[in-house]
A protein has these predicted regions:
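Alpha-helix boundary/capping detector
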Residues: 39, 110, 169-170
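Cytoplasm-proximal transmembrane signaling helix
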Residues: 150-175
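Extracytoplasmic/periplasmic ligand-binding sensor regions of membrane-associated signaling proteins
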Residues: 1-69, 73-76, 121-123
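Charged, low-complexity, helix/coiled-coil-prone segments
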Residues: 4-9, 51-53, 97-101, 130, ...
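Intrinsic low-complexity, intrinsically disordered coil/linker regions enriched in small/polar
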Residues: 45-46, 60-143, 147-155
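Short alpha-helical segments used as structural interaction elements across diverse proteins
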Residues: 38, 86, 161-163
Length: 175
């Protein structure tokens, strides 16, 4: 047997009478010694809490699936809960478990907003990215897509450099 009564998702469901799905931040399994995200719902019997039913999802495997959508080597997809806890991240995933997004982010401050965007240096790796975010059907979850600006602008910078070089060569040849 595995005791779950001290897990946050279990406590949250035990204390709440509403019938809802809870997605936990990554937890380290006591038996498996592997990270998992628990997707859980309370079992109610005669209107009283009687336990939980849950499924463990591997954040590493989930992140691998999401990584197939990335365009650049430093672009990232990140799933956070409503409080900004990182559930999974496609870059360096396991090193971000338990970390939290800055509390000034719109998706934390304004739970009524469904989507948005911003430009920021990532708090976890310092890379400047433009982020788009959307609240999923479960309003407790937010998916962020971050595109590394330096990488995204590299082709434009290269073209600009070539155009300046052509202008200099043209000026030298035709003057």
């Amino acid at each position: 047997r595995n005791y779950l009564g001290d897990r946050d998702y279990f406590k949250e469901l035990a204390a709440d009478k509403a019938d809802r799905l809870v997605v936990s931040p990554p937890v380290l399994g006591r038996l498996t010694k592997k990270w998992s995200i628990q997707v859980a719902r309370a079992i109610q019997r005669d209107g009283r809490f009687d336990g939980v039913v849950s499924i463990a999802v591997s954040p590493e495997e989930w992140a691998k699936q999401l990584a197939s959508f990335e365009a650049g080597p430093r672009d990232t997809l990140t799933l956070v809960d409503a409080r900004g806890h990182v559930l999974l991240r496609t870059l360096d995933g396991a090193s971000h478990f338990g970390k939290q997004a800055p509390q000034k982010r719109e998706y934390i401050l304004h739970p009524e907003q469904r989507e948005g965007h911003y430009v920021a240096h990532a708090s976890v790796d310092g890379v400047l990215r433009v982020y788009g975010w959307t609240r999923l059907r479960n309003p407790e979850l937010v998916m962020l897509s971050g595109i590394a600006l330096e990488d995204a602008l590299a082709p434009v910078r290269e073209m600009s450099h070539r155009m300046r070089l052509r202008a200099v060569v043209s000026a030298v040849l035709f003057t």
